[in-house]
Amino acid sequence: MIDLDNTLIDRDAGFRTGLLALLDDRGLPAEHADWIMEIDQRGYTPRPVVAKAMLDRLDLGLTEDDLITALIACSRDNARLAPETAAAIERARAAGHRVVIVTNGPVPSQTGKIRNAGLDRLVDASIVSGAIGTDKPEPAVFHAAAAAVGGSLADAWMIGDRDDADILGAHRLGVPSVWLHLGRTWTAPDYRPTHTADTVVEAIDHAANA
């Protein structure tokens, strides 16, 4: 099981690419991207909140609804998969492992990212929380991932960048995990990942060979 945003794909890089194009289209300086990225908080700030902050400071010539739609498109339409990540997925599957994406978020945006990154052609299944009505770290998300490939959590691993979603969810179910640290230090006192990785390629290879 592998998380999508900022794990399989660099969601922040994709969002920034789209954001810069949006600012350029509206005739605004690229320097605004920095504070917008801060408000965005890796995609965890609700889109209406980001849109309101932008409209309060910038003359975008857009309605709030149109800006929300544009912000969703920024990350969805610029989702890209690194070749080395694709190769790691292929190695894991060639070794007999089933690879399932497990991602929080609305179905249209998340499935759009998966498709635009070409992941729909590489993985065995994808579970989007919006389709099942609950988010990671709730057990139902992980059980749905196992069921999607006719498997069991008994021999599963979870890979992700979020301590409070990916790693906590795995911990509660007794599933070993790999945390993609992205330059951060682990701070949760009550649980820890089984392994910490510098890159998603390292994470996939570790889980596949454990």
Regions found by a protein language model. Name each.
Residues M1-A87:
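N-terminal helical cap/lid subdomain that shapes the substrate entry/recognition surface
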Residues D65, A86, E90, A94-A210:
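Asp-based, Mg2+/Mn2+-dependent phosphohydrolase catalytic module
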